[in-house]
UniProtKB/Swiss-Prot annotation:
Name of the protein in question: Protein mab-21-like 3
InterPro entries with a match to the protein in the record: Mab-21-like_nuc_Trfase (IPR046903), Mab-21_HhH/H2TH-like (IPR046906), MAB21L/cGLR (IPR024810)
PANTHER family: CELL FATE DETERMINING PROTEIN MAB21-RELATED, PROTEIN MAB-21-LIKE 3
Pfam families membership: Mab-21, Mab-21_C
Top-level lineage group: Eukaryota
Family: Belongs to the mab-21 family.
SMART domains: Mab-21 (SM01265)
């Protein structure tokens, strides 16, 4: 067995991980500028879609909540250079949420049980399938004060705000905006399966595939199905958990009928001060992410993404909450890799906030098995990878 030392890991961080971070940061900067221009143009044509500059606590609906905005700024000051709407899933694959406007005062309510409509509005003999654990219906009546513009047959059917219809309107506006802004040489719309809007963005470093998803941002509200924090858990602290829940969650238009629950703001806050006790959690995450991208799971559409690794880190932090558990850099990296190997081998990784949902449920099992073999080889010979 070829072993590795803390010094080897520190050199790996300096020579490989930091280089990757600089390259990705440059690409994010380029993509952010282009998508901001495009979504600003889209918003000028239809105010229901906002610029990504208004994502998160910059959302226009939060102007009357300065305390929440101040809290967010204080938490992420100096720690988060990226726009909160942008999630880097791999060096060449980004997910960007496009905030929606005009849906105010959300409250969870019991929705009617069955839907019998198609996306074109015609009737079905049997009902549309029910949403899975990480999805839900979204009705106009869930909002105290939806703007009149949302009472629009192009986006709703029988009182439901239908993701596929919202995406279709957005896609038409986006294609027009690419031409209006003269960005046809930098942005091209890709063929998509389902409701996704996928574009290829040319940057100074690489071509980036971007998935654009219209998103309802729900601040100061935590969904009942996300039973978190769990009883008798010591990480994060009660105060931090209360703060995180105040930032709410998102509903993303990522399927035909149902809206996907997303906790991206909560995840950003969890990461922002994850090592305030002087631990090495974030360093471990960065090393494992680099190993994944270099050898275990490379490519533009990896079966394991940065989101999976982030989720794994949160579960590991919860299981090992003490400062002393995160002092041995080498040991902590190997522990995280071992946990990743177990999840990939079993094809099972629980969502951190809705733990009944398996994030690997629909992943390609052959690809997962191949990744598991590579991770196992690393665990047998870590020194051959860390140099």
């Amino acid at each position: 067995m070829t072993n590795c030392t803390d010094e080897d890991l520190d050199n790996y961080l300096l020579n490989q991980v930091d280089l990757r971070h600089r390259q990705v940061s440059k690409c994010v900067e380029d993509v952010q500028k282009i998508i901001k221009d495009l979504t600003t143009e889209v918003s000028s044509k239809d105010a229901r879609f906002q610029s990504i500059a208004n994502a998160g606590v910059h959302n226009a609906s939060l102007k009357d909540q300065p305390a929440l905005m101040s809290k967010w700024s204080a938490l992420l000051r100096g720690r988060c250079a990226y726009n909160p709407a942008i999630q880097v899933l791999s060096p060449t694959l980004y997910l960007i949420s496009v905030p929606l406007q005009g849906l105010m005062g959300y409250k969870e309510r019991r929705t009617r049980q069955w839907r019998y409509y198609t996306l074109t509005g015609s009737r079905l003999l049997s009902p549309v399938r029910e949403p899975e654990k990480l999805h839900q219906w979204l009705e106009l009546e869930s909002f105290v004060n939806p703007s009149q513009e949302w009472h629009d047959a192009r986006m709703t059917i029988e009182g439901d705000i239908v993701p596929a219809k919202v995406v279709n309107v957005f896609k038409d506006l986006l294609e027009t905006s690419i031409k209006t802004r003269g960005l046809t040489n930098k942005v091209s719309v890709l063929e998509s399966v389902g409701t996704a809007v996928r574009v290829a963005v040319e940057t100074s470093e690489a071509q980036i595939e971007v998935k654009l998803v219209p998103t309802v941002e729900l601040m100061n509200y935590w969904p009942k199905r996300a039973r978190w924090p769990r009883l008798f858990r010591r990480w994060p602290s009660t105060e931090r958990a209360r703060c995180i829940k105040s930032f709410g969650f998102n509903l993303m238009a990522s399927s035909n009928y149902h809206w996907l629950l997303s906790f991206s703001r909560a995840e950003q806050v969890l990461l922002s001060n994850i090592d305030e006790d002087g631990g090495c959690r974030r360093k471990c995450y960065r090393v494992v992410r680099q190993l994944k991208e270099d050898g275990w799971c490379p490519g533009s559409k990896p079966v394991i993404t940065a989101f999976h690794l982030q989720t794994l880190l949160f579960w590991t932090c919860e299981k090992y909450p003490c400062t002393r558990d995160w002092k041995d850099f080498r040991g902590c990296v190997l522990r995280l890799v071992q946990k990743l190997h177990k999840c990939v081998s079993q094809h099972y990784l629980r969502h951190y906030f809705i733990r009944s949902h398996n994030l690997l449920k629909y992943s390609n099992t052959n690809e997962l098995d191949e990744v598991a073999k590579k991770i196992n080889h690393f665990l047998e010979n870590p020194g051959t990878y860390i140099h």
